[in-house]
């Protein structure tokens, strides 16, 4: 066993002990994990929560009860009404986990440690970027499922882009979501950053926490391969910073139809500075050190590797890797000015469903870590808050998939139906306006679309990919 193997095994054993004793443990924020009641739900008993409350098309104060003790936080709108109706009909929310399985540490541990058996069949594609760096796209091609359901109009399966956590670990959560999405008729594809999960680091540059430049090129390439298919995106945990940064920077020009974030880290800087409970902090830190140790020689010219591998916290590791570089050192403040995932959140024009748990041991309690004002003020952001689920867990009794996966795919289906109805209404309006010169305007739009399509290949100045 390598020298780090014993340390990793010890950390996993401690996490297992935390999972078994979870209900008795107190989080680092001073309250018992798992004893928290959702805000606004203190006076409701379980029966009232399961009923879901008032009419589906009415909002009281931006927080609506859902089955299973969950609640939806959002700004009232037609889209919110559509999503609320879909969630209240969802069977996934009603089927809660077993009582002994609802501990936050146990759910989190199962998510990060237990494998999915059997795992999906992956076809890897390496994408060479504009600066000659490489990212990897793992297309889920199997196992083949009979009777796959088509997820969009016209018989074109939608593409589901999945973004793992920022540490590069391919977890049970990601693989389980891909298998379920494949069964439901999607084309799942997993995005891997530079140097993550076997993707070679061919240039001494890693992707900062919230820099979406590599993801932009990957999304454009996916769009090039599937120009007519709808594109949905899902991120887990710390990987949500990348997705939110992309949606904010691209705004209405994003190719994404809808997105979801599982246990997102929204206040990223505060999250790094406050630190995690020590078993998680040490576990994530050890995983990153092991992953980058193979590139220690290649990084020596740009990073103080001695300082990097001596770091004792996630913040020290992040600072050593991206702030204290030898060529262009920057301050911690400047780093987060460029990488805060919510820096351009007002520009996002894509519906985003965030699924969070009140007992999340990694992110912390929702009243400290969730920016609820974002969901109350922005019509594109929706927060599904549950009492239990841990960090990226939301597990149910086997062989049922995590209920978060079911809810995400159901919400995407509701979004598809909503947009299809909106397009039908707009189509009728355009048909009525055709007698007022709409014919000439339609011709101009058609010419612009053809021109855009003909110039699409010019976007790919790299246009080089490798498969294996």
Swiss-Prot record:
One of its GO terms (cellular component) is membrane. Disulfide bonds: none annotated. Residues 33-61 are annotated as: Disordered. The active site is at residues 360, 391. Keywords: Phosphoprotein, Secreted, Signal. The modification Phosphoserine is found at residue 434. One of its GO terms (biological process) is lipid metabolic process. GO terms for molecular function: monoacylglycerol lipase activity; short-chain carboxylesterase activity. Residues 1-23 form the signal peptide. It is found in: Secreted. InterPro entries: AB_hydrolase_4_sf, AB_hydrolase_fold. Interacts with PDE3B; this interaction regulates PDE3B's stability and expression and, thereby, impacts the antilipolytic action of insulin. Belongs to the AB hydrolase superfamily. AB hydrolase 4 family. May regulate adipocyte lipolysis and liver lipid accumulation. This is Protein ABHD15. The gene is ABHD15.
């Amino acid at each position: 066993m390598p020298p780090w193997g014993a340390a990793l095994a010890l950390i996993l054993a401690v996490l297992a002990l935390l999972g078994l004793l979870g209900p008795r443990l107190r989080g680092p924020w001073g309250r018992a994990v798992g004893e928290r009641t959702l805000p606004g739900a203190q006076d409701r008993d379980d029966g009232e929560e399961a009923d879901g409350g008032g009419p589906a098309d009415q909002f009281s104060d931006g927080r609506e009860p859902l089955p299973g003790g969950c609640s939806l936080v959002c700004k009232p709108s037609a889209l919110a009404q559509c999503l609320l109706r879909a969630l209240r009909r969802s069977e996934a929310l009603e089927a809660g986990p077993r009582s002994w399985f609802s501990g936050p540490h146990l759910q989190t541990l199962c998510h990060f440690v237990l494998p999915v058996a059997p795992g999906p069949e992956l076809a890897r594609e390496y994408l060479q970027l504009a600066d000659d760096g490489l990212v990897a796209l793992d297309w889920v091609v199997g196992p083949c499922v009979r009777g796959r359901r088509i997820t969009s109009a016209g018989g074109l399966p939608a593409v589901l882009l999945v973004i793992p956590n920022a540490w590069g670990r391919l977890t049970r959560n990601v693989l389980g979501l891909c298998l379920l999405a494949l069964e439901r008729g999607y084309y799942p594809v997993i995005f891997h950053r530079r140097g993550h999960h076997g993707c070679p680091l061919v240039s001494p540059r890693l992707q900062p926490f919230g820099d979406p430049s590599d993801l932009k090129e990957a999304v454009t390439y996916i769009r090039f391969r599937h120009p007519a298919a709808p594109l949905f995106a899902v991120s887990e945990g710390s990987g949500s910073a990348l997705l939110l940064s992309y949606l904010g920077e691209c705004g209405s020009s994003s190719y994404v139809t809808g997105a979801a974030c599982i246990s997102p880290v929204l206040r990223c800087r505060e999250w790094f500075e406050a630190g995690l409970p020590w078993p998680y902090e040490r576990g994530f830190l050890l995983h990153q050190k092991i992953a980058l140790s193979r590139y220690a020689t290649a990084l020596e010219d740009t990073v103080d590797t001695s300082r990097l591998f001596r770091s004792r916290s996630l913040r020290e590791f992040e600072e050593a890797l991206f702030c204290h570089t030898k060529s262009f050192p920057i301050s911690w403040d400047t780093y987060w000015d460029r990488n805060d995932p919510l820096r351009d959140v007002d520009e996002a024009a894509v519906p985003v469903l965030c699924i969070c748990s009140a007992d999340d041991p990694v992110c912390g309690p929702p009243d400290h870590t969730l920016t609820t004002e974002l969901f109350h003020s922005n019509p594109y952001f929706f927060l599904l808050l549950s009492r239990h689920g841990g960090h990226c867990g939301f597990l149910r009794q086997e062989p049922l998939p995590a209920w978060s996966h079911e809810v995400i795919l159901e919400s995407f289906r509701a979004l598809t139906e909503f947009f299809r109805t909106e397009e039908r209404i707009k189509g009728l309006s355009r048909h009525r306006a055709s007698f007022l010169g709409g014919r000439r305007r339609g011709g101009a739009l058609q010419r612009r679309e053809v021109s855009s399509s003909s110039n699409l290949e010019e976007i790919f100045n790299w246009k080089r990919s490798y498969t294996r």
